[in-house]
């Protein structure tokens, strides 16, 4: 039998639950939760983020990368 978890956690949108209306590119601690170890943006199907907030999240991460607040890739 495959190594499946006993139960599947229900995905929920963190931004809707916490009442966050706008995602700021300067909030690095929040953005790091949605970037993988190798620097890629984690998709909404894994995080459970709504499409509206996922678009804001992508834009905020791209802006933070451009301003060198977040790395583009991992530390080799």
Swiss-Prot record:
Q: What does the entry give for GO biological process?
A: translation
Renumbered to this chain, the signal peptide range is: none
- What would be an example GO MF term here? structural constituent of ribosome
Alphabetized InterPro entries for the sequence: Ribosomal_bS18, Ribosomal_bS18_CS, Ribosomal_bS18_sf
Q: Does the keyword RNA-binding apply?
A: yes
Q: Which family does it belong to?
A: Belongs to the bacterial ribosomal protein bS18 family.
Subunit record text: Part of the 30S ribosomal subunit. Forms a tight heterodimer with protein bS6.
For this entry, the protein name equals Small ribosomal subunit protein bS18
